[in-house]
Structures are given as C-alpha cells and as structure tokens.
Amino acid sequence: MNVILLEKVQNLGSLGEQVAVKSGFARNFLIPQGKAKPATKENIAEFEARRAELEKLAAEALASAQAVYEKMNGTVVTIESVAGDEGKLFGSIGTADIADALSKAGFDVERKNIRMPEGALRYVGTFEFDVELHSDVVASITVEVKATEE
C-alpha cells in the first residue's frame, strides 16, 4: 500500500514522501495516528495544498524539542528505592519512574520516549539513558538510584 507521510517516521521516511508499506502497518498504525494518508490522487492534491503548513508545524516541533534538549541534556535525576544489603532493589525502576522523576525536575516527557535498552533497573547505581524528544533530537540523562531505609 502506498501512503504519503504527514510527518517524519523513523526508519521509514520524512514529511511528504510517498512510501510503500504493508497494508496492515498503514491501517493499524500510520493512518490512525495521523502519521500518513493513503496515496490517492485526492490526498496527494490535498497534501500539496497543505505542505507549507505541515512543514511549518514540523519546524516548530523540532525547534521546541531542541529548546528542551538544551535544558535536559546532561540532567541528573535521583530516584530512591528500598534495596537489600547487596544493592539489589526490592522491585525495579522502569520508564514510568524515570518519567515521574523528570517531571518533578520540570520536564514533560512521556515514558515511551525513554530508551532503556537493557530493561528495568534492579540495582543501586548510576545509569545513562537516552530520551527521544523528537525523531532528530535525543537527549542524554543520568539516573542515580539510591537505597533508602524502608
């Protein structure tokens, strides 16, 4: 199925490109999320009429992501959790916990944008993670996990 991308989609293409994707991917993901439209003659004409507006919105989103990047990159957040004698946490710390800590630090981040390639944190220590603010802007943060006395 051919679709027109209405925004940049990672590993697929950028705004305005016509790409061939599997029909299920288009129907179940791209079209419902407003990232693409079927590449019909009517939709192509409508897109060309709105191209400048969509490019302006994309540029504004990139500019705001870069502004947040300037403030967030290198930020250190501390999360306290109950841990055993050897530093193993009772439970784990995941993306939701990191997103909460970032929101307390003044950053509005969705948990799906936090990249934890090795999964949830289960030990006390200092860890580095990436936060995808935009498909072109990725900030690096440091999370310090400290043990608390119950």
Curated annotation (Swiss-Prot):
PROSITE patterns: RIBOSOMAL_L9 (PS00651). Keywords: Ribonucleoprotein, Ribosomal protein, RNA-binding, rRNA-binding. It comes from the Bacteria. One of its GO terms (cellular component) is ribosome. The keyword Heme does not apply. The keyword S-adenosyl-L-methionine does not apply. One of its GO terms (biological process) is translation. GO terms for molecular function: rRNA binding; structural constituent of ribosome. InterPro entries: Ribosomal_bL9, Ribosomal_bL9/RNase_H1_N, Ribosomal_bL9_bac/chp, Ribosomal_bL9_C, Ribosomal_bL9_C_sf, Ribosomal_bL9_N, Ribosomal_bL9_N_sf. Pfam families: Ribosomal_L9_C (PF03948), Ribosomal_L9_N (PF01281). Belongs to the bacterial ribosomal protein bL9 family. Binds to the 23S rRNA. This is Large ribosomal subunit protein bL9. The lineage of its organism: Bacteria, Pseudomonadati, Pseudomonadota, Gammaproteobacteria, Thiotrichales.
